[in-house]
Amino acid sequence: MIMSEYRHIELSDPNLERDHLRLLTFGSPALKRRGDVTLFLPPEVETLLNVPLVILLHGVYGSHWSWTFSGGAHLTARKLIAEGRLRPVVIAMPSDGLWGDGSGYVTHASADYEKWIMEDVAGCVTELVPALSARSPLFLSGLSMGGYGALRLGAKYAGRVSGISAHSSVTHLHQLKSFVDDSPDADAICNSADELNVLYWMKLHRETLPPLRFDCGMGDLLIEENRQLHQALNEMQIPHTYQEFPGGHTWEYWQKHLTDTLLFFESIC
């Protein structure tokens, strides 16, 4: 057990870990309770400094293990590193804070799920991993609700984030009603409903927005929302890359196109 400004930190035993995955639980000031993170720590980072930190956000119903044991994110990253196509990176895959079926990664009355990601996860992981520092590039990505989180938080904290990539994204919090009974928009705390729209933050911070890409499957129920975001960004002349591929709102799609995200981040470094 390690004492830290994040209260009690529990890490899995390296002797029992597999596939370069490490499990982390710590007391989060933003959540006011414990939070969970799965880490991918390739062996190459042990001798490196200031390596990139990639935060992958999951969708509704999921948790910190979703990107690994449903999406094989660590296997994709390991393959790309071994092929020399991706430099060694640390990947942090946090839970969304476990509010209802999905917190939306926004501030609620009971807990701040936005600060959980941007302050606690990024801060605690950087504190624990010697290869990371304040100079490490920070990249955000996610799928569905996690795509919304990556787009919104990446745009809101544009000065801190080096790149954004999202898959099959919810583009406004109210769209989660298509997936869950209790949408987090009713519990969200913000100055105006506009702040729950990813486009609001992209427009507000257009001058400092980091490199941005997003994609969606042509058979995805969110395809029209993603096309509308693409069109709106074009009309505002905000640089971005938007791609459509065959596929739906499935792990098969996200497993395949995580490669696009990681190679996009590599191109920025």
Please identify what each model-predicted range represents.
Residues 1-269:
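Non-catalytic cap/lid and distal C-terminal segments of serine-dependent acyl enzymes
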